[in-house]
Amino acid sequence: MDEREQVYLAALAGLLHDVGKFAQRADAPLREIADAEARRDVKYEHALAGYSFVQDFAGMLTADARRELSGVAYHHAPKSDADERVRLADWLSAGEREELDGAKDDQRVPYLRSAFSRLQGFDGKWYLPLERLRFDYAVLFPRQGEPTEWKDTYRAEYFKLWEKFEAACKPLKTISDPYVYLETLYQRMLEFTWCIPSAYYRSVPDVSLYDHSRMTAGLAACLAQDKRSGAWCRATKNEDEIAILVVGDISGVQDFIYTLASSGAAKTLRGRSFYIQLLTEVVADFMLRELGLPPTNLVYAGGGNFYLLAGVTQKDKLEPLSCEVTRRLVKAHGGALHLTLAYTPLTQGDFQRPRFAEAWRRLHEESLLPAKHRPLGALSEDDMFALVGEPLGTGGDSDHTCSICGAEQQKGEQFEPGESGAETVRKCELCQSFEALGAALARATHLVWLKSPVPIQPAEVHSWQTGLENFGVRVALVDVSKPLEKNNAIPALEGVTLARISSIQEEANERPLNVALGHIPTIRVTRPLAQMVPPGVPTFDALARRSQGVERWGVLRMDVDNLGKLFQHGFEREMENNLTLSRLAALSLSLRFFFEGWLPNLATPQEDDAQDLRNQLYLQYAGGDDLFLVGAWDALPLFAERVQRSFAAYTCGNPYVTLSGGISLADERYPLYQAADDAHEAESAAKGLRDAKNALAFLGQAVPWEQFADVRKHAYELAEWCKDKGAPKALIQTLIEIASAYERDRKLDKPRFGRWTWVSFYQLTRVAARVKDTNVKEGVIAIRDAIHDAMFKPGGVIETIGLAARWAELLSRKQE
C-alpha cells in the first residue's frame, strides 16, 4: 500500500468514524457481528454501528484497506496506529463542542441549531429540518421552536433519512478503488448529514455531523501523511504542531471580471465570473493533488479564495507550489491573476477553544496580509524577468484590439467581428469563449468535471477550457436534451481518471452522460450553482428596454456586513471565543447555500410580491457572502429587498447578521467597470450610513432596510397617482424640491422650521385640492401632515420622500 492510499484511507476512517451516530438515532438494526471480542472492545454503540456500516458497504475494498478503517470501530479504544490517528483527529475536531448547561433529559433532542442562531451573543431557538439537502425553502430555512416539540417524531424522521442514505450509498458496495470510494461517500455525507448534529447530549448542537466528520477526516489524513505513530498520538503535547492551515487568494479577480468596456460585455460577464468560480476550485484541487491530500482537506473554496489543511511535513512544498500556480496563471492571463499563498502551523492547543480564533487572526494578519503586499512575489527571478520583459504590444490600433477586454490581437488569433447596437465589436478568442460559456450555462443540464493529467508545461490560453486544463481538470457544460456526440459537449477522455457530475436541472436524464463517459469512475456531486439568466442572454441596452419608465440598466452589489468580524468575534460568549475550524467551515457552507443555492429563487413570484423578475435580471456572480447582478434598473431595488427579507429569515432574525447593498444606473454607452465602481461606492455609502450598516443605497441616498418598504410603497403610489389617478405631475417635482430644501437646511444644522416647512404645507394643500380621487387626496394630505410633523420630531417621511419622488419620477418617465 503506497503512502497516498494510506492517507486516503485514514481520511475515510475519519469520515466514517461517527456515521454510527446517524444509525443509532434512527434505531437502525445492527449487522450481526460474530466477533464477541470486538463487541466487547468497541465499547460505544455508535462505534459498533459504524463498524456495521463498513462491513455492509465497504466489502469491495481490499482486506488491507478495510484494516486501515478499523478506527471507525476502535477510535474510543485504539488497537493500532491507524486507530490512534482517528482518535486524536476526532478529539481535536471535537474541540468545538460547547457544553450545554443545565440541560434536562427531555431537552436533549438531536436537531441541529442553525449556524446563525448563536452569533454575536444572539440566542435564538432555530433548528434545521432533518431532510436530504435540496435548495428549497422547506429544507434550507430553519424553523423556530423548542426541540421538545419534536421529541416524539425525531426517531421516525431519522429513520426515514437513514433509509434514503443507505439507498444512496448502495453504489459504494461495488467500488474497489479507495479514492473513488472516499469521494463518493464524501458527497453522500454532505447530502444526508449536513443537517444532523455531531453531538447534542451534553453539548450545544450547532456543529453538523458532516462538518465534524470532514474535519476529523482532514486531520486524520494529516497525521497519516506525517506518519505519526500511535505512541506519538498518545504523547502529543499542547504545543506540538499537528497540521498547517493554508489560505490561497487568487488576486486580481475584481479587475478581471469587471474592468470591461460596455460594448458586448454583458454576454461575457457571466462566463468570466463563473470561470473564476471554477478556477478557484480547480486551483484548490491542484494544490490537494500535488500535496497528496484528499478532498476532505479542503475547508472551503469560493470567490477566489480557498482554505485547506496540510500535514506539517508538507510545509516546504507550499512555496514552490505557490510559484507554480502563479506561473501557470501568468501564462494564461499575463499577470492579471496570480496566487497569494499564506499559512500558519496549528498546534494541538490551537484546536481547542478559545485559541483557534487567535490562529485565524494570525493566518490573516501576520501571514496573508504581508504576502498580498508582494504581488507576484512567489515567482522565481527567471519567471518574473520573463513576465516583465514581454513586449506590451504596439497599442493604438482599434481594429486589432478586443472591444471588451482591451487585449491586442496575437499572431494567428482569430478576432470575431460583431455588432452591439450601432457599434462594431471585435472579440478576442478568450472573450469569445467566455461568451460561449455564459450561453452554455443558460441552457446546460449538467456540469461535468473530468480529472486528467496535469500538463508539464502550461499551454497558451485562448479559451476558458485551456485555463482550467493547465491545472489538470477538463470541464464541460452539457445539455443532455441534445445528442452529445454532435455538439462535442464531452471533452477528450484520454487520461481521465475520475468524473464528477453536478445536476443543474434536477429532472434531467443522466443516461446519455453515463453512456458517453463509459467506464470512467463517476461521482454525483451536490453543488449549488446560482443561475439567473434571461432568455437569449441580453445585452445591457436590451435589459434597459425591459425597464418600466426610463430606459436604463443598472448594477446591484450586496454583501454581508462585517463578515470578517463575524468570523473572528461572532462566536464569543461569556468572555470566551468559541470559534473553531468546524464552526468556520459550517458558517462558510451556510452562506454558500444561501447565495449560490437559494438566491435565484428570489426572482420568481413571491407570496407577498407576485412580480416575476426573471426576464429583467442577469445574475453575474453569487457566492461566499456577496452578489453582483446586472438588470433593468427598476427590478434591482425590488430584488434587493427580497434578498434582504429572505436573508433575515435564513439567519434566524439575528439582528447582528445583516447585509447592505448599492445600486448604480447606466445608459447603453456607460462602461461596465464604471457602473460596477458606482455600485461599489453606493454600497460603501450604505455601510457608512450608521454603525449597524444594514442599508441600501439607491439614487444617491442610503436608506436603512427598516424604512425601505415604506419608500418603495410611496414611490409606486406616486407614480400611479400621476399616471392613472389624476394627480398633477408637478406633485413629484414638488416633493423632490421640498426634500432638497430640507437637505440643504439639515447640512447647515438647521433641519427644523426652515422655508421648506411652510412651502410644503402650502403647495401640497393646493395639490390635494386639485385631485378628485378621494384616496389620492387623502394620500397627499397624509404626506403633507407627515412632513409637517418633522418640524417637531426629526426623521420620518421627510428623510426619504425625496428618494421616493425621484424613484417615482423615473418610473413615470416616458420611454425614450
Please provide the spans of the model-predicted regions:
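Charged, helix-rich terminal subdomains or tails
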Residues: 1-303, 309-816
